[in-house]
C-alpha cells in the first residue's frame, strides 16, 4: 500500500504539471516548509524594466538614470538594457571612459570625469560604502559618484499573465 501511495502522489502532482522524479523526492517534499522559484523566462517574461528610481543627496531621478545609462552604454546585460531603455536617449559615449565590469557585482568607470560605481550590495561592501537597506522585490542597482551614495534604481521582471499563482 505504501508504493501505491507514492504512485498516487506522483500521479496527482503530474496532473498539476509538477514532475517528481521518484518516491524519495516525494518523501522529502513532505518536510518542505518553503518553496522558492527562480525561473526567469518560465514564470516571468524575462523582460526587465526599471520599476523605481530612488535618488538621494540633491540629485533628480533623471540625473541618476542618466549617469547609470551612460555607464551601462557598452553592456548588453538585461539590467543594463532596462536602464538604457528607461533613459530613452542614446548615451553620449564621449562622456564615458575607463568602464570596468565586475562580474556578478556591477560596473565602475568615469562619467564626466567623475568616478561612478554602479552595482549590487556586494560591490558597495567591496568599496566600503554603506548604503541604505532597500525593501524591494526587484534587483537593486546602487549608484555612487566619487565614493558618495547617489541613490538606487530598482529593476523588476514581470510575471507572465499565464503563470500559475503560487
Question: How should each PLM-predicted stretch be described?
Answer:
Residues 1-166:
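Cytosolic catalytic headpiece of P-type ATPases
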Amino acid at each position: 500500500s505504501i508504493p501505491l501511495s507514492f504512485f498516487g502522489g506522483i500521479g496527482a502532482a503530474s496532473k498539476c504539471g509538477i514532475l517528481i522524479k521518484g518516491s524519495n523526492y516525494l518523501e522529502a517534499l513532505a518536510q518542505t516548509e518553503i518553496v522558492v522559484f527562480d525561473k526567469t523566462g518560465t514564470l516571468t517574461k524575462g523582460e526587465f524594466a526599471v520599476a523605481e528610481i530612488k535618488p538621494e543627496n540633491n540629485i533628480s531621478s533623471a540625473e541618476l538614470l542618466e549617469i547609470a545609462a551612460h555607464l551601462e552604454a557598452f553592456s548588453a546585460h538585461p539590467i543594463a538594457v532596462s536602464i538604457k531603455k528607461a533613459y530613452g536617449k542614446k548615451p553620449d559615449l564621449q562622456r564615458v571612459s575607463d568602464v570596468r565590469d565586475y562580474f556578478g557585482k556591477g560596473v565602475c568607470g568615469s562619467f564626466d570625469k567623475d568616478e561612478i560605481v554602479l552595482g549590487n550590495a556586494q560591490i558597495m561592501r567591496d568599496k566600503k560604502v554603506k548604503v541604505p537597506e532597500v525593501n524591494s522585490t526587484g534587483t537593486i542597482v546602487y549608484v555612487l559618484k566619487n565614493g558618495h551614495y547617489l541613490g538606487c534604481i530598482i529593476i523588476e521582471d514581470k510575471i507572465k499573465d499565464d503563470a500559475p499563482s503560487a
